[in-house]
């Protein structure tokens, strides 16, 4: 991960910009630079992953134009080969192709990128700024306006709090130019429904996911894998292990009392022959880390915070004890193939609508969690299930095939990898809520801690002062109060609490955990 920031007009207060930008130096601890473009400021904190030499340091410059980009551009070598006919390059960085690409294609370039990215371009010829974000929002970007009405962009909301009145997430799949946000890609939209037979669909799913993992193994820095023992991360690890000439490094975490995941993660690690590490977390670590995790995340969402506790502590351990710089994770599978609660979808049409909603909101929930937990520990997250070709294909598959009519959720994904990729019991293991999987006790400790902080009268009184996404439990109130401490008045960055679709029968619940659903069954065992 890297961190970027831009002030898009002259007369910027350099010291204020620098102070705001320092808040995300952990995203890019290798080098930092702020430049004056003549009409504003651009900042870059570098975490070197591709092109590790100083020549790969940003901003990149081309005839008075500049770019800063937090991104990974897959297959950039082919684009670079074509651009070499007209341009010279000084580094091995994938992001150096961006300015030549912009000169050749303008904002049409964004449709051409197979990438996860957030970028800011200063067009020196037109004296204006362009910003853009990848179609899913895997790389973070926020914007706001200062007192003079000047727009600012930054990798995280914390960079802009205090400098801008109202901070909002930059919409994924959009670019900003001439005061307008323009959508260049709606990754959740379906151009044409795919009616291939089951075996063809599963063959395509298998091939496209393998390709998505493959391209994310390319790095000049060392790569590791988060392995929960659940279906999604286990598949990523199994695919990578087949592609690697030496054992991959896998990491799992769980509570000391009742970690469900650790035994399954070890079973997978033994099966694929990985160099595996288990990290144990305690009640004290969870409670002591809570405020820092919420400050890091920039959210009050219950499930995002719960699921971040283990991920943050695991990534912290990896940062402090290894030389790994890149981590592959299993996010974005549920949004595509279904959660436990989508078993209750009343129709294929409703299943598809819910999937589209979840994909379009990913940048506020699971993707945000993975980015912050990993990047705050000076690591880079890569998400194979977020591969654009893979997502586009799965979204196009007839939703009737994706619904759970097989007696097992996410059947297409499971069936696609039947064979010897994973042990059968792992491949067909019931999904466990992540907060359950690291240990039932973790969520119980968080709830217990919150319960002890407020009387019933205090709880009711404190909840009343919030109008947007009003807290409804003592746990949610605690998270909101910590959020407001660091992001005062910025709650609209998050549209609402992540919850199952309450309009569906069986889903009208008041806790985001799948544990409260009637179909959870054996999932948490």
Where are these regions (language model features)?
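N-terminal glutamine amidotransferase
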Residues: 1-68, 72, 101-196, 203-214, ...
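Structural signal for conserved beta-strand scaffold positions within catalytic alpha/beta enzyme cores
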Residues: 44, 91, 183-186, 252, ...
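A short, aromatic/hydrophobic, helix- or strand-capping loop or linear motif
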Residues: 27-35, 90-95, 141, 405-410
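Conserved S-adenosyl-L-methionine
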Residues: 184-185, 423-432
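ATP-dependent adenylate-handling active sites, centered on carboxylate activation for C-N bond formation
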Residues: 8-14, 85, 104, 125-130, ...
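Short, polar/flexible loop-turn hinges at active-site or ligand-entry regions and domain interfaces
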Residues: 83-92, 107-109, 160-167, 300-302, ...
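Acidic-aromatic/histidine active-site loop/patch
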Residues: 98
